[in-house]
């Protein structure tokens, strides 16, 4: 069993890639599950609805989890996974089960993504493609969950891809660093992100925009940042940036 996490903006060719890879491996006798996020979204709406994206994501993660618990050789997690934290969620599902995982990043230009989106049967709004493209966080090998990443500039299933998958995608959570993380820096990340959180909630309260749901989402985001970013300055920048996106989406429905 192994987990292959696909990532790339809408229109990068992930689903075509996944289908071709699954077909080739099945011909060799592999038991492959292709978990296609867009197909799951099709059960939730007839036309793209950003308000249901969180529900779609939860359904996608649950489907991947179910497949990882089955007797299979490969699970392909096919979604944009445009934030690093989204790929981390999937890696943790594999790690919990002691299943090796790897990432295929389909690096694609915006013009190509927009053209392919227009050509697909049920295109998503162009502004959504542009927004996700602008927000996309490419995998970085210094993150333990992105250590085994294959970057492709086209969506062909090449010998390089097959070798990457068949090698076992051997990735383990890294050993503890020789230099332990300074506890004071961890505490500073917590304190400073709490300060930013308080500042944001005061601002929202003054404008009458503070809601319980928005507070919950910002709290979840802050906990995610605290658990994954060690540098206080970087943590504050990341939290501010992501928090503003969450606020815009909640207040204006930008999804």
UniProtKB/Swiss-Prot annotation:
Gene Ontology biological-process annotations: conversion of seryl-tRNAsec to selenocys-tRNAsec
InterPro entries, per the entry:
KTI12/PSTK, L-seryl-tRNA_Sec_kinase_arc, P-loop_NTPase, Ser-tRNA(Sec)_kinase
User: What does the record give as its pathway?
Assistant: Aminoacyl-tRNA biosynthesis; selenocysteinyl-tRNA(Sec) biosynthesis; selenocysteinyl-tRNA(Sec) from L-seryl-tRNA(Sec) (archaeal/eukaryal route): step 1/2
Q: What does this protein do?
A: Specifically phosphorylates seryl-tRNA(Sec) to O-phosphoseryl-tRNA(Sec), an activated intermediate for selenocysteine biosynthesis.
**Any idea of its EC number?**
2.7.1.164
| Keywords associated with the record | ATP-binding, Kinase, Nucleotide-binding, Transferase
Q: Which family does it belong to?
A: Belongs to the L-seryl-tRNA(Sec) kinase family.
Please give the name of this protein. Answer: L-seryl-tRNA(Sec) kinase
Its domain of life reads Archaea
Which SUPFAM superfamilies would you find in this protein's record? P-loop containing nucleoside triphosphate hydrolases
The record's section on CDD domains has: AAA
**Pfam families recorded:** KTI12 (PF08433)
The catalysed reaction is: L-seryl-tRNA(Sec) + ATP = O-phospho-L-seryl-tRNA(Sec) + ADP
State a single Gene Ontology molecular function: tRNA binding
């Amino acid at each position: 069993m192994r987990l292959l996490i696909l990532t790339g903006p809408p229109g990068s060719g992930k689903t075509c890639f996944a289908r071709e890879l699954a077909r080739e491996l099945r011909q060799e006798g592999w038991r492959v599950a292709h978990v296609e996020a867009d197909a799951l979204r099709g059960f939730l709406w007839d036309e793209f609805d950003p308000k249901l994206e969180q529900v779609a994501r939860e359904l996608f993660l649950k489907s991947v989890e179910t497949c990882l618990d089955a007797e299979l050789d490969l699970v392909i997690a096919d979604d944009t996974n445009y934030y690093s934290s989204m790929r981390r969620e999937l890696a943790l599902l594999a790690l919990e089960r002691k299943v090796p995982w790897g990432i295929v990043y389909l690096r694609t230009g915006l013009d190509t993504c927009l053209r392919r989106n227009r050509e697909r049967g049920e295109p998503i709004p162009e502004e959504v493609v542009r927004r996700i493209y602008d927000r996309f966080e490419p995998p970085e090998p210094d993150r333990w969950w992105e250590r085994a990443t294959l970057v492709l500039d086209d969506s062909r299933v090449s010998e390089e891809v097959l070798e990457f998958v068949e090698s076992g995608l051997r990735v383990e959570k890294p050993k503890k660093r020789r230099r332990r993380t300074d506890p004071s820096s961890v505490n500073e990340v917590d304190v400073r992100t709490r300060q930013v959180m308080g500042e944001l909630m005061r601002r929202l309260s003054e404008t009458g925009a503070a809601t319980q749901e928005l507070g919950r989402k910002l709290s979840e985001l802050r906990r995610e940042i605290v658990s994954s970013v060690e540098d206080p300055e970087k943590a504050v920048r990341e939290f501010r940036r992501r928090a503003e996106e969450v606020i815009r989406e909640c207040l204006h429905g930008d999804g």
